[in-house]
From Swiss-Prot:
Subcellular location field: Cell inner membrane
Gene3D superfamilies: F1F0 ATP synthase subunit C
Site (Reversibly protonated during proton transport): 64
Family: Belongs to the ATPase C chain family.
HAMAP family per the UniProt record, alphabetical: ATP_synth_c_bact (MF_01396)
Presence of keyword Ion transport: yes
Name of the protein: ATP synthase subunit c
Subunit structure: F-type ATPases have 2 components, F(1) - the catalytic core - and F(0) - the membrane proton channel. F(1) has five subunits: alpha(3), beta(3), gamma(1), delta(1), epsilon(1). F(0) has three main subunits: a(1), b(2) and c(10-14). The alpha and beta chains form an alternating ring which encloses part of the gamma chain. F(1) is attached to F(0) by a central stalk formed by the gamma and epsilon chains, while a peripheral stalk is formed by the delta and b chains.
Any one annotated GO CC term: proton-transporting two-sector ATPase complex, proton-transporting domain
Membrane-traversing stretches: 13-33, 58-78
Organism phylogeny: Bacteria, Pseudomonadati, Campylobacterota, Epsilonproteobacteria, Campylobacterales
Domain of life: Bacteria
InterPro entries: ATP_synth_csu_bac/chlpt, ATP_synth_F0_csu, ATP_synth_F0_csu_DDCD_BS, ATP_synth_F0_csu_sf, ATPase_proteolipid_c-like_dom, F/V-ATP_Csub_sf
Pfam families reported for this sequence: ATP-synt_C (PF00137)
Amino acid sequence: MISIYAQIASFSAIGVGIAIGVAACGGGIGMGIAANATILGMARNPSISSKLTTTMYISLAMIEAQVIYALVIVFILLYANPLLTETIAAAAK
């Protein structure tokens, strides 16, 4: 019989893998769409390419920030899992 501690740890590991995978795929798709729109805008109006490039870099940074937030949550679930600490505290009572 698997202990509740091991079950929480294993489910957390599975959730972490899914979370970072979805975040990375979503970020990659979003960055591709942003770059595509910028290139199309530059092709239509080359005179504003510097403004479009600046706006694209800001957009890419915001998209990447969401992936980094997901990575922070992943590290919290892996190394400082609040579910495990609550389980240990409940078992000690």
